[in-house]
């Protein structure tokens, strides 16, 4: 079983909202076969607390417009790592140092990547990596 079409379209809507707020290193991972709780993890990086807040707020608004209801939001006060659960999609917005330290891509490397539109990944990645979302594809 792979991520549903609905989960994939929500993921793209969330990724577009994050990209509009200059989120970097966008990656989408299909965790549907490993987790019964959700289909997709969307990962995004923000430069600092204010940037993370702006990304999360934009994603929240886009998901609301798309009809997804937020179940829970964790970590917003500190804004080092914010997790927002929309049921089929869980969005993780991390500051760079936390993203590197926790290395969620590496933890879920056995799960397939969900290809994001090239305009979202190319424009918002500092080093040009992560087209399709997986920076660790060569590792």
Describe each PLM feature range.
Residues 1-33, 47-54, 61, 66, ...:
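Long, contiguous binding/interaction regions
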Residues 36:
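P-loop NTPase catalytic core of nucleic-acid-dependent motor ATPases
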Residues 39-40, 81:
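A short beta-alpha structural unit
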Residues 40-46:
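Short glycine-rich or small-residue beta-strand-to-loop segments that form or flank ligand, phosphate
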Residues 69:
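Extended, positively charged loop/linker patches that create polyanion-binding surfaces
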Residues 89:
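Active-site beta-strand-loop-beta-strand hairpin of nuclease catalytic cores
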């Amino acid at each position: 079983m792979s991520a549903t079409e609905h989960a994939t379209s929500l993921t793209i809507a969330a990724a577009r909202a994050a990209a509009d707020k200059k989120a970097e290193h966008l990656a989408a991972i299909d965790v549907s076969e490993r987790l019964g709780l959700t289909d997709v993890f969307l990962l995004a990086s923000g430069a600092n607390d204010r940037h993370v807040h702006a990304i999360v707020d934009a994603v929240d608004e886009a998901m609301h417009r798309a009809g997804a209801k937020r179940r829970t939001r964790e970590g917003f006060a500190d804004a080092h790592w914010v997790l927002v659960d929309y049921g089929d999609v869980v969005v993780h917005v991390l500051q760079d140092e936390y993203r590197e330290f926790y290395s969620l891509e590496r933890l879920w490397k056995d799960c397939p990547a969900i290809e994001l539109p090239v305009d979202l990944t190319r424009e918002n990645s500092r080093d040009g990596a992560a087209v399709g979302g997986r920076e660790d594809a060569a590792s």
